[in-house]
Amino acid sequence: MEVQKLPDQSLISSMMLDSRCGLNDLYPIARLTQKMEDALTVSGKPAACPVDQDCPYTIELIQPEDGEAVIAMLKTFFFKDEPLNTFLDLGECKELEKYSLKPLPDNCSYKAVNKKGEIIGVFLNGLMRRPSPDDVPEKAADSCEHPKFKKILSLMDHVEEQFNIFDVYPDEELILDGKILSVDTNYRGLGIAGRLTERAYEYMRENGINVYHVLCSSHYSARVMEKLGFHEVFRMQFADYKPQGEVVFKPAAPHVGIQVMAKEVGPAKAAQTKL
């Protein structure tokens, strides 16, 4: 998943969607995700404390210098609740932190920032380029020294071996890959995930990218993506992943497998496939 040189990012980076948390009539997708965020949280627990419903926040491009703040947020609101991390009791993992920030140079990841300058939501995205026929796929797990995280990367490598999104969309050369969508639990229910996703759609339209790809290891994440108009293009049960003859991942219900979701934001034409 390498970066293709795209049009000047300076214009993109200067654009902000200035909005008030309570004014969810600006975007239909924000109204939808407000309902979804009310119903679903990663942990399933309510927000720890109430927040000001009228607090202003902006949607901004994540900058390289935001890395530390992004990781701090993910440690609090994402890493500990991700099903595979939880099952393996992953704990502190510098390799995971580095891996999470890897797509930032693609200049298509966005953050929600409150009036105090705090990051209250992120959508980390990367760019996927169609591989050349003679390309040898790199295995992310080969260079990982953390034994538990290596298991997760090995699973991701296996999924890439079994499924190629470019086979589904034979006319596409570049696809946006949604990596991590996370919202501060104290600000859920305010449509932030919808605003982050809408900004990603705008990026796609600005750069002629037609397809949005998201890999979900969480049942809840897959349901949210469905509500956002994504559809399933690949599925693999955790019970079917047996690299050494034994099942590696047995996360708690309802997390039963990997789902790859896709959405056509532009005029993409999908090939006829069977799940």
From Swiss-Prot:
One of its GO terms (biological process) is melatonin biosynthetic process. This is Arylalkylamine N-acetyltransferase 1. Residues 181-254 form the N-acetyltransferase domain. Pathway: Aromatic compound metabolism; melatonin biosynthesis; melatonin from serotonin: step 1/2. The record marks R188 as: Regulates binding affinity for coenzyme A (CoASH). Disruption phenotype: Has a darker body color. Shows ectopic pigmentation in the wing hinge, the posterior pupal case, leg joints and cuticular sutures. RNAi-mediated knockdown in astrocytes, does not affect numbers of astrocytes present in the brain. Shows normal baseline patterns and amounts of daytime and nighttime sleep, but while awake are less active. Upon overnight mechanical sleep deprivation, results in increased recovery sleep next day. RNAi-mediated knockdown in neurons results in normal patterns of baseline sleep. Shows lower levels of activity while awake during daytime. The record marks K227 as: Acetyl-CoA. Its EC number is 2.3.1.87. It is found in: Cytoplasm; Nucleus. Pfam families: Acetyltransf_10. Keywords: Acyltransferase, Cytoplasm, Melatonin biosynthesis, Nucleus, Transferase. Optimum temperature is 37 degrees Celsius. Retains 84% of activity when incubated at 4 degrees Celsius for 3 days. The record marks E82, S217, S221 as: Has a role in the catalytic activity. Belongs to the acetyltransferase family. AANAT subfamily. It comes from Drosophila melanogaster. Induction: Expression at the transcriptional or the translational level is not regulated in a circadian fashion. InterPro entries: Acyl_CoA_acyltransferase, GNAT_dom. Changing Y241A: No effect on the catalytic activity towards tryptamine. Catalyzes N-acetylation of tryptamine, tyramine, dopamine, serotonin and octopamine. In astrocytes, regulates sleep homeostasis by limiting the accumulation of serotonin and dopamine in the brain upon sleep deprivation. Is not essential for sclerotization. Changing E82A: Reduces catalytic activity towards tryptamine. One of its GO terms (molecular function) is arylamine N-acetyltransferase activity. It catalyses: a 2-arylethylamine + acetyl-CoA = an N-acetyl-2-arylethylamine + CoA + H(+); serotonin + acetyl-CoA = N-acetylserotonin + CoA + H(+); dopamine + acetyl-CoA = N-acetyldopamine + CoA + H(+); tyramine + acetyl-CoA = N-acetyltyramine + CoA + H(+). The gene is speck. The lineage of its organism: Eukaryota, Metazoa, Ecdysozoa, Arthropoda, Hexapoda. The record marks Y99 as: Might be involved in substrate binding.
